[in-house]
Amino acid sequence: MHNNFIFERAILIFAVILLTVTSCADAKKNYIIAVSQCSEDSWRQKLKQELEMATFFNEGVELRFASANDDSHIQKRQIDSLLSSGADLLIVSPNQTDLLSDEIDKAYEAGIPVILFDRKTDSRKYTAFMGADNCQIGNMLGLFIADKLQGKGKIVEIIGLRGSSPAAERHEGFVSAISRFPGLEIVRCEYGDWTEESGETAMKQILSGYDGAVDAVFGGNDRMALGARRVMMQAGRDISNTLFVGVDALPEPDGGMGLVADSTLSASAIYPTHGDELMILALDILRGKEYPKETLLQ
């Protein structure tokens, strides 16, 4: 009886040791996480820094980055290259919804987990999505403008990159909010590509065919709003009572928060990066843990 007890305890101890060793091995397993960024702006630099910081708390994680500089064809090639380099998981922010679907589908069908971050594609072939509610952001800024203008005024909108999901969703939410106020009118819309220069180009195009009042400018992001503001000043427009609003609100002197603080912009909606949460999601997927299919960042 005594020998049986000792034998059973020995088996139990061995099982505990085996589980511990296995658990440690899983925790220390090396992973290659590929990150395909559609651009290299300040917002994406912040995300990159947060992901890199997260690797200090997660041993055995190697990050491989590629930036497409707003070119969907370059991003296609970069995704192929990242996958062929032996990536265990792909994080991708598609430049445009339709042009990147095939490459992302290819990765998913090959058994490589795919996290869509910030942007979606036309396909449902992805492992998880993480990003903010862009429609809500556009709606919120529309209501802000409506409140400040007391429901009356002429509005110009500079939309983000044509074919990108944040641009389409922010526009949709903004128009939905403005349409609730009969006294508000969106007099002109032009597309940009998220850069300050494209905001300038869009506003020049608008002013070349419109010389009426502009009470508010909604930029799809802060940089386009800033570019539009500069052109209005250069054109000799009185902007002392014009609202300029954007999206991103980066906590930097020349970011959205700084621009609102010095009254260059009237408002900027925070567009969260949360690279730490993105890393947790990626590792949960790789380690076979439960994870949400859709995560909306606040």
Which residues does each predicted region cover?
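Short, hydrophobic alpha-helical segments
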Residues: 83, 145-150, 207, 278, ...
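Hydrophobic alpha-helical
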Residues: 80, 89-108, 174, 187-188, ...
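Hinge/cleft segment of the Venus flytrap/periplasmic-binding protein
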Residues: 12, 24, 162-166, 177-178, ...
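Short, low-complexity disordered leader/linker segments with a strong preference
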Residues: 1-32, 105-112
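Hinge/beta->alpha junction and helix N-cap segments in small-molecule ligand-binding domains
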Residues: 36-49, 64-74, 96, 119, ...
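Signal peptide-proximal N-terminal region
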Residues: 49-65, 179-182
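Flexible loop/hinge segments that line or gate small-molecule binding clefts
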Residues: 97-136, 144-147, 154, 160, ...
